[in-house]
Amino acid sequence: HEVLAAASFDAILLDVPCSATGVMRRNPDVKVIRRKNDINKFAALQSELLHSVWKLLKPGGRLLYATCSVLPQENDAIVGSFLGAENTAHSMILPQKVGESTAYGQQVIPSVLGGDGLYYSLLVKPLL
């Protein structure tokens, strides 16, 4: 198990484990196996991963936070809380948007565009 040095990466794609509510059309078992308290567990893990991985990003680097969830608790709530706690982060609006704009990112809703639901938010670490 190799330990990575802080500020090692220019860019990171953080596709976190989630409730998979955006892919229920293809995976209907999600409706049966998910419990209400699963969302809180996923949210805690997502927050922990985001805070941990942020340390690996170089100044000037970009991190794309992504889920296959349509739940705000796993998306904007995680990013908003992170931005409130991490003063070296800000969200960036992507020039080419897919989905509906949210406070901190973009949400793709399956019933609107077809396909799977997902969320993404681009976070930037300022140069020192």
State where each predicted segment sits:
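Arginine residue identity/basic-tract feature
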Residues: 25-26, 34-36, 62, 97
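C-terminal catalytic and target-recognition region of SAM-dependent MTase-like enzymes
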Residues: 1, 6-13, 17-20, 40, ...
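Conserved P-loop NTPase nucleotide-binding/switch module
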Residues: 21-32, 68
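Glycine-rich S-adenosyl-L-methionine
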Residues: 30-58
